[in-house]
């Protein structure tokens, strides 16, 4: 059985693959020029909403999980525009998104960050879109 975080990453990646050829569910993917443009889907921070616990401590856990979707490409002076176009596509694909096996999960767009790096005559850029998904998992009631 896989953890819900893995299921969420896989479902988001499946949705993104409808528009992007190179989508990976890890931030540890080594990318080469032939992999560009690429999209990385990974999770960062997860917190539990303690105030929603049942009084006996065995109710469903309400989890807030941050999902990073990082679009990476190579370009010249058009790189900002290329990254913004990728971000717009990602936002459109995830607007109103529902996870097939977790209909109670709520996905919210949180933030965007960009970064660029120059290596010789190549400019590498990334735009990271962070989403928060709130979902529930059951605990085992010992009573």
Regions flagged by a language model, labelled:
Residues 37-41:
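A short glycine-rich, His/Asp/Glu-containing loop-to-beta-strand
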